[in-house]
Amino acid sequence: MKLVATLSSPEELELAEKADVVELRIDLFDFSGARVDKEKILTCRRVSDGGKFEGDERERIEKMKRAFDSLNPDYVDLESDLPDSAFDFNCRIIESYHNFIRTPDYSELKGIVEGRRGDLVKIATMGKSKRDVETIVRILTNYDDVVAFLMGERFSFTRVLAAYLGSPFIYCYVGSPKAPGQISLDDAREIISRLG
């Protein structure tokens, strides 16, 4: 498992020294020209998926392609509802699904995982009940190359639990949280060292 620090500024890049991977959120800051000596995930999140990018899809994909050429990321994060043509990047693809209202049932999430076009699938849904925890655990135990967790303060533990169920990444923050229930990089590192 690798610790991913989600970044929204160059100052946070300095705070992410202990991260294994950095997620460069170009919807929050223009990282072009930034020197990053770690594995990188390039993300430009739409407003509907918890980000700040407000333009149309064509503009967003073009922005990502320009940033791709400048930053040379190891991964690009693309939403699961995009057409196949958007998945034309020469790197590993994280196909992501976000739901800030609820956690869909297992069969719907299973469809997302089994229909994936990316190398990894990231599922982040709003947690409301124990049943939601069960749904995410089922996805993680039945599939490989899946990052899946529940959003919300009450369910922040699922971010670490997911790593022990095979999730390749734990998304963390440095500076300030970028999503509901996101845990700090320092806290994640401490929890992992205590759990072994």
Curated annotation (Swiss-Prot):
E.C. numbers: 4.2.1.10
InterPro entries: Aldolase_TIM, DHquinase_I, Type-I_3-dehydroquinase
Highest taxon, organism lineage: Archaea
Keywords: Amino-acid biosynthesis, Aromatic amino acid biosynthesis, Lyase, Schiff base
Reaction equations catalysed: 3-dehydroquinate = 3-dehydroshikimate + H2O
Protein's pathway: Metabolic intermediate biosynthesis; chorismate biosynthesis; chorismate from D-erythrose 4-phosphate and phosphoenolpyruvate: step 3/7
Transmembrane parts of this sequence: none
Top-level EC class as recorded in UniProt: lyase
Molecular function via GO: 3-dehydroquinate dehydratase activity
GO annotation, biological process: 3,4-dihydroxybenzoate biosynthetic process; amino acid biosynthetic process; aromatic amino acid family biosynthetic process; chorismate biosynthetic process
Self-association and partners: Homodimer.
Family: Belongs to the type-I 3-dehydroquinase family.
Function of the molecule: Involved in the third step of the chorismate pathway, which leads to the biosynthesis of aromatic amino acids. Catalyzes the cis-dehydration of 3-dehydroquinate (DHQ) and introduces the first double bond of the aromatic ring to yield 3-dehydroshikimate.
Protein name per the record: 3-dehydroquinate dehydratase
Organism: Archaeoglobus fulgidus (strain ATCC 49558 / DSM 4304 / JCM 9628 / NBRC 100126 / VC-16)
Lineage: Archaea, Methanobacteriati, Methanobacteriota, Archaeoglobi, Archaeoglobales
